[in-house]
Amino acid sequence: MIQAFYPKTKHIAFISDNTYGGVTMQALVRKEMKKFPDLDLILMDGRRHSIYTIVEELRQLPENTVILVGTWRVDMNEGYFMRNATYAMMEATPTIPAFTPSSVSLGYWAIGGALPDYRKVGGEMAMESIRMDQHPEDTGKHLSIIGSKAVLDSRKVKEWGLHPSVLPFKVQLVNQPVSFYQQYTYQIWSACALFVILVLGLCISLFYLSLIHISEPTR
C-alpha cells in the first residue's frame, strides 16, 4: 500500500511502545521488512524513548519517509498515555504520511493500513470447548487464523490527494461522508409523522366544522 501510493519511499519509521504488544509488533515488522531490502527501517522504540524524545526524533526524520504507527500506550518511563500522545506525534510530522497495521491513529492521523479482520469468536470458542470435552483423545489443534483487510480513511485519502484505484487489491473505505438523509433519518421521519398527524387533525377539524355549518340552518 505504501509503495503504491508513495513509490519514492526510502525509509519506514515504525512506532512501537514499551508493552508486550509493542515488542511483538516490532518483531513482526522486523521480520516482514526483510522482504523489502530497498527500504530502511527506522525504529521508534518506546523501550528507549519517552513521548518527548520520540516527538523530537520524529521531527528529524529524513525525506521520503513514511510513518508506520504500531501502538503507543507506555513509554520508557512506564508512563501511560491515551490518544493525546499520538496527537502530539501527528502535530510534529504534518507533512509525513502515516499508515498503521493496528488501527491505532486511524480516523485522525493514519491514512490507512492492513488491519486484522476481527470477528465474533465466542461461538467458535464454545464449540471448541465442547469438542475438547467430548473428545479428549483428539489432541489435534483446530485453530482458525484471523485474516487481514486493507482499510483506507476516505477523509485522509481526499486530504492527501490519493487514488485508491492504484492499489492492486481490494480496499475498504471508512469514515465516508454520509448523506443528509442518513445523518438525520430519525429527525426526518419524526417531522414527517408530525406533519401527517397535523394534516389528519386539520382534516378532522374541517370535517366537523362542515357538519356544524350544515346542521345550523336546520335548527
Predicted features and spans:
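Residue-level detector of conserved catalytic or cofactor/ligand-binding positions
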Residues: 210-218
